[in-house]
Amino acid sequence: MPRMSLVLLWLCLCNSAWALSSARLDTPDVRLSLGPHMSYLEDPRGNLSLQDVQNTPSERFQAVNHDHVNLGKNTSVWWFRVELDNRLAETLPGFLEINYPLLDHLQLYLQTPDGRVSQQESGDRFAFTQRPVQVRNFWFPLQLPSGNSHLLIRVDTTSTVFLPVFFSTYGASAQAQENLMAWNGAFYGMLFAMVFYNLFLFLSLREATYFWYVAYGLNVGLLGACFDGMLFKLLPDYTALQGVSIYILLFTQTLAAAQFSRHFLHTKDFFPRLDAGLRLAMLVILALLLSGLLLDLQLWGALASLTLLSTSLALLLVGVFMWRQGVRYGSYYTLAWSVLLTAFAIVTAGSLGFELLGLYGATTIKLGVTIELITLSIGLANRINILKDEGFNSRRAAEQANLANQAKGRFLAT
C-alpha cells in the first residue's frame, strides 16, 4: 500500500510538472497553442495586483491541460500564467493571439529574462483603434529575447471566459489567417447568396415567407460577424454597442426564427392555437430583450443564450408536430432545425463552461447555420411546388365540377 501511494504521488508530480512545463520555441517560424502550458488563478473579488500574483505560490495555480481555456460565465477575474522558452540565440518576434473577440478587458504583462516588465491591454471595452494590433481578435506584439520569459494575462469579462491562446511568428500567423479567411469567405458568400436569392423571390412573388427568410438570414450574418469580431471592426468607435450587440442579436434571432416559422409552416391557417402560442412566445422574447435595461449584463447574456436554445428546441418540436400532421415540407423544416439545435446546444453549453464533443466557437455555429439555411431554401422550393400542385389540383377539380354542372344542365334542358 505505501508503494502504491508513492507511485500515485509520483504520477501527480509528473503530471503537474508536465502541465506547467514551459512553451518551447526553437524554430524561427512557429505557431504554438499555449493552453497545455498555461495555469490559472481565480481572483473572485478582482483586487489582486500584479505583485500579488507574482508572489502567489505555484501550488495555488491550476493547470489548464487543454488546448484552450474555457471557464464559462462567472463574475471572477482570472489570471493566466505561462512561461515562454526561446531556445534560439536571437530575439524571436511574433504575436500573442487571443482569438475570442468578446472578452471585455485584457491586461498582458511580459517579464523578460533581464527582469524588465512590459504591459499591454485590449478588449471590447476599447475602441478598435486603441488595440495594439488592429485585427478582429485580440493580438499583442511580442519580442521574446533568448531564454525564459514569463507571461501573465489578466482577464475581466462578462462574457464566457474562453481563451484560445497562441504564440505565432509573423509568417505562421499569416498562413493560419489565410486558411481561416478562405473558410469565412465561403460562409459569408453562401449566406449572402441565399439572402439575395430569396430577396429576389420575395420581390417577384410578394410572399411574406421569403421576406422573413431574408430577415432571418441577415440576422444570422450580423450574429456571425459579431461572434467573429468583424462587427467591431466595421463599427470601430461604438464601444458601448460592442458589449451588448451579441445579446441583442441573439434575441432578435429568436424573434426572426419564430416569425419565419409561422409563415413557412402556415400555422395561422392550419393550427390557429399553435400560431397563437408562437405569437405569445414572441411577446415573451421581446419582453426579455427589453429586460436588458434593468438586468445585470452577465445575467442578461446568460438569459439570451438560454432563450435561443429553448426557442430552437420549441421550434423543432413545432416542426415535428406539423410534419406528423401531414404538412409535407415540415420534413425540411425539422431537419434544418435539428442541425441548428445541435449546433446551438454545443455552443450554449460551451458558453456556460461545459464543452460537448470538445467543440465551441464560431465554426460550430457557422457549420450549423450553413446546413440549416440551405435546407430551408430547398424546403421553400419544395413548398412552392406543393402549393402549385395543390392549386393545379384545385383548378382541375373546379373545371371538372363545372363540366359536370354543364352536362347536368344540358340533360335537364332536354
What name fits each language-model region?
Residues 20-181:
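Soluble non-transmembrane domains of integral membrane proteins
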Residues 194-219, 267:
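Juxtamembrane interface at the cytosolic side of transmembrane helices
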